[in-house]
Amino acid sequence: MTLESTQDPRLASPDAGVRRIAILDIADAEDDDDLPTLVGALRDDTAVEVRAEAARVLGGWGHPAAVDALANALLDADPGVRANAATALGQLKDAGAGTRLLPWASHAEPSVRAAALRGLKELRIAAAAVPARTSLTHDDAAVRREAVGVLGWLKSTEALPAIARLATTDVDAEVRRTATGALGLSSEEGHATVLPALLAALRDASWPVREEAATTLAKLVPHAALQALLAAMQDDAWQVRLRAARALGRLRDATALPALIAALAHPMGNLRKEAALALGEIGAVDAVPALEVAAADPDPEVRKTARLALSRLAQGGAA
């Protein structure tokens, strides 16, 4: 594709609003020949609203010129333009754009680096693992968080020890939460590396981290986590209890029956539903009386789930 621009006369208007509408119309036409016009508006227009609009619409192009323009816009003087450029980079779908974006993942400016890593995560190119691993120890929390995201999406098992350390020791709760979720890429052979970190995360001071730990344990279903998950059924945050109930259902260990039956009386309907579902998965007849009570729950979703669990039990156990 050549980069010969077709110029809309409205772009010469002294009215920034007119120029912005022109940018929208040009983008809606989806004509590759108009790409230079959008790139030029992002680079050169004096009005913030025009540059911001150009950054927003350029996310639909994977051409190297668009990637370069968006990456450069991460250094724009206006925070709105920078934010739109970062969002647009995260919408890139063409893996070929990754080669243009890779150098920006090592940029000295943390916000630029984080945005580049976010874009690379969506593209899932193997070469992104190198700057991502380097960024795991960056001073900026947003950079560390995006680096974990890249490695998680790439399923980089080599990075699991470093990610496990972040899950338990990072000073930023959102980094710990993201790292805890990324530990779910572990294979059964890698459980020895990640299980201690997940059990520690299940006791984190931040409830979203604890919730993420229970969610990840539900994916990995290691039986060694049984006691920790039972303890999590007493967590102050119902969201953590819900994820723990899901994990216990997947473990299918009758030891969890008392905790799950107790959860059927929780005031939060979503938790009651998850407890009923878990009891059905475990398939123990001792849960029948509690499930029969839950089958008359005021919440229709709880009733439906409890009746399904009873049906499974009547057929001889979990599905």
Question: What annotation goes with each model-predicted range?
Answer:
Residues 25, 57, 88-91, 119-122, ...:
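Core register positions within helices of long alpha-helical scaffolds
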